[in-house]
């Protein structure tokens, strides 16, 4: 369960339990930056369930780190704590006009192509695509998602095709790339690694024109 910060959603515990209700044997990982401390009554609902916390430590920015650790220990919830380190610059939205082989390489190198995202009734495999579409920063292309509210008779087949995608999505051409190792990636067009918690200044308010 990822965000932003998932604990900002008041129903985060309810959502997590809903995922586990579908398959009680699975393990759910909740990613947090320890800016918000979960409530005791929320953590109590995970008793006997496979819930783990993955805590990214941003030093002073993770202002509730001690409280979060104390709460997780109190409720015997496993956690993993890791320093934030660096971010990969991949925030710009722009059309690259890549060839098909280059698009396949972008997709091959991507670390976010299996981060399934449900937004406004549409299922995506990539949070970049879902958020760019929500901002209307990229053209609406039905090949990028599955509309779960559609009246299609072959919805299951569409979902299966989406999650098994091996080539690329049309929206990949608007992405700088999300490689595991930007220094080695062949098709990465961002600015490399930046210190976690720091933002790259943007000269204009929006780096794209709205698509309609």
Residue ranges and their predicted role:
Residues 1-108:
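Conserved glycine-rich "GG(E/T)P / GGGxP" loop and the immediately following alpha-helix
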Residues 94-200, 206-209:
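Accessory C-terminal segments flanking Radical SAM cores
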Residues 212:
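ER/Golgi luminal nucleotide-sugar-dependent glycosyltransferases, focusing on the catalytic module
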């Amino acid at each position: 369960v990822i965000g932003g910060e998932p604990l900002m959603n008041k129903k985060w515990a309810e959502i997590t339990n809903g995922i586990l209700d579908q398959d009680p044997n699975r393990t759910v990982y909740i990613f947090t930056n320890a800016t918000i401390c979960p409530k005791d009554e929320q953590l109590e609902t995970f008793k006997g369930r496979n819930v783990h916390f993955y805590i990214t430590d941003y030093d002073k920015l993770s202002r509730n780190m001690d409280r979060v650790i104390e709460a997780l220990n109190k409720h015997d919830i496993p956690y993993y704590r890791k320093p934030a380190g660096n971010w990969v610059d991949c925030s710009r939205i722009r059309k690259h006009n890549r060839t098909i082989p280059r698009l396949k390489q972008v997709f091959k190198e991507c670390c976010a192509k299996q981060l399934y995202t449900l937004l406004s009734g549409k299922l995506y495999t990539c949070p970049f695509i879902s958020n760019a579409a929500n901002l209307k920063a990229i053209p609406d292309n039905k090949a990028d998602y599955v509309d779960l509210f559609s009246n299609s008779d072959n919805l299951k087949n569409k979902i299966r095709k989406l999650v098994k995608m091996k080539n690329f999505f049309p929206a990949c051409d608007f992405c700088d790339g999300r490689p595991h190792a930007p220094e080695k990636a062949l098709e990465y067009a961002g600015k490399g690694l930046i210190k976690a918690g720091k933002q790259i200044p943007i000269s204009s308010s929006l780096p794209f024109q709205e698509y309609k």
